[in-house]
Amino acid sequence: MKTAVLMATYNGEKFIEKQLDSIKNQVLAPDYVIIRDDGSTDGTVEFVKDYIATNDLVGWNIIKNQKNLGWRLNFRQLLIDSQNTDADVIFLSDQDDVWNLKKIKKQVEVLSSHSEIEVLSSDIEFNVSTDQAAIPKSYVFSDNAKELSKFPINRFYNVGFRQGMSIAMKKEFIDRFIKYWKEDYDLLPHDSLIQALAGLLEVGYNLNETLAIHNRHAMNASGRHDVTLKSPKKFHIQELYAKHQGYYEIAYKVLQDNNSSLAQVEKKYYEFTKRRVAN
């Protein structure tokens, strides 16, 4: 199985080297590493270019976005980029974490030996470096003493069993949903979308083994909250559209393609959310 790592960067010059090292030094080296920078104002792009050249890394590439997309759409674009490779398994990466050197090997072994699994997360360790860091809660699988735990079915978008940087997935899973993810659904987190869909389709599992260290600090994009109770009404409407409606439309269409009995349930949520946005 060929592999590709997708990494989103933004002003990560101070943090990125350890993550790059942990990917470069994998026991099973990735065939491709695609990095998209979202308009960094520090030396991130130059640092990565030098790193690739110095280490003579074939299949590694950094692309600088023409405009700032935001981390959600940056990952969406990376998923689209992955479709232009012949990789079989796609890994998601943040810019400031550290992978176990057997991460790629272990997740590929599971995916290659289990045809029923299309999305595979893993356990992670949290390293909190500042008081301002947001510490996400980890979902506890009831059967976590086993090697693998299946994602439960959750009909709502805001599901997160593990952080996105723990996820490996088969390319055909991306094929299921990427065509339905519109650019104006720009508040939809990629990791929540992937895990929710994998649960609904019953193709998502967690490898109950710690395979990465997830660093939490004040600069983590996922730790920032965009809309609050004090936000103007127009921002709440935009969130309803770009996050909730977006998720339910994608879920409905993916389930419909799969002839799932859950498609009509998600369709009702989709139509209800559309009415809320319109009113």
Give the ranges of each region predicted by the language model.
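Nucleotide-sugar donor-binding/catalytic module of glycosyltransferases
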Residues: M1-S231
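Generic detector of well-ordered alpha-helical segments enriched in charged/polar residues
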Residues: K49, I153-N154, I174-I178, Q238-Y241, ...
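Helix-centric, low-specificity signal for extended rod-like, repetitive segments
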Residues: G12, D96, N100, H236, ...
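Short linear sequence motifs
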Residues: T3, N68, L240-Y241, L262-V265
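Solvent-exposed amphipathic alpha-helical surface segments
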Residues: N55, T85, H114, I250-S261
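Catalytic core of nucleotide-sugar-dependent glycosyltransferases
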Residues: K146-E147, H214-A218, G223-S260
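Membrane-interface aromatic/basic loop that binds lipid-linked glycans or pyrophosphate carriers
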Residues: K253-N279
